[in-house]
Amino acid sequence: MSRRRAAVRSHAEKAARKGAAAALAILAEEAKRRTPVETGRLRDSCQVRTEGQSGSVIFTAAYAAARHERREGGKFLENACWDPDVRAAMGEEVRRAFAAEMR
């Protein structure tokens, strides 16, 4: 692999990591906003975990999965994932990361 190609690849990988982290942060904030609040523990248990160019948003409270599956006020993470505005904002963060890194 040429030196130039290796440099481009390195920058692209760095941009992907930054973009993924920024996009997941947006998703986490929207999911927390949609989370039903009684004590705040569920909302406070939201975490973003990244590994390389991918990651996840999770709620670690013991009752998070059960609460997510309820009809009333449920699906707070899933619905945030499918929201077109959230998806657009996440995509924009990835685009910005690539634009900044690939100058």
Task: Describe the residue ranges of each PLM region.
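Short, Lys/Arg-rich flexible segments
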Residues: 1-103
